């Protein structure tokens, strides 16, 4: 019995080794799981479910194969793929979750999320996030021709990269008070998230009790997953 969590794969055709590693993960490790949760940024970018990118179709087929084998797959949107919609969910068999979800995992209440909402010290990013998560803005963007959406997405990624290069690492990490506030709001002692690309297990205090924040790593030179069993919560790095 095990439930698996991954995040921040940033899949793109320019990184075939990561794509191949994910396909192997779906075919091997994930097949033995009770469920798979993908906590955002599965893709490097997502400009709409109507994008004919062959990689998207390939990943939908692979995830659907996992689901059809009896392993449910759940997805929380990240900051790169927040426009993944019902069409891709239907094609892949994934179940879309809200940005915060509490799970009962073998007797543990665990809060899961992508993690970008915890980075409240980065006021510039939070303002940008509020704009692009506006439903009206999203509907307008999705009405644009694909070639225009691609240009806008490329410009936004370039702008984000430039902005991040001038920010301190502390600003781009989670805010400790926000973490505690979220855990106390949901009355949990466990939090699993991604986004920051800083894999670690942090011990803290919430609800006047010991608590734990487990951060998934990004898939670059190796894969990263959290494996939750009735007896343990493990952060695991593995070769791609």
From Swiss-Prot:
Binds 2 Mn(2+) ions per subunit in a binuclear metal center. Mn(2+) 2 binds at residues 41, 79, 114, 195. GO terms for molecular function: manganese ion binding; UDP-2,3-diacylglucosamine hydrolase activity. It is a peripheral membrane protein. It holds the Pfam family Metallophos. Keywords: Cell inner membrane, Cell membrane, Hydrolase, Lipid A biosynthesis, Lipid biosynthesis, Lipid metabolism, Manganese, Membrane, Metal-binding. Mn(2+) 1 binds at residues 8, 10, 41, 197. Its cofactor is Mn(2+). It comes from the Bacteria. This is UDP-2,3-diacylglucosamine hydrolase. The lineage of its organism: Bacteria, Pseudomonadati, Pseudomonadota, Gammaproteobacteria, Enterobacterales. The gene is lpxH.
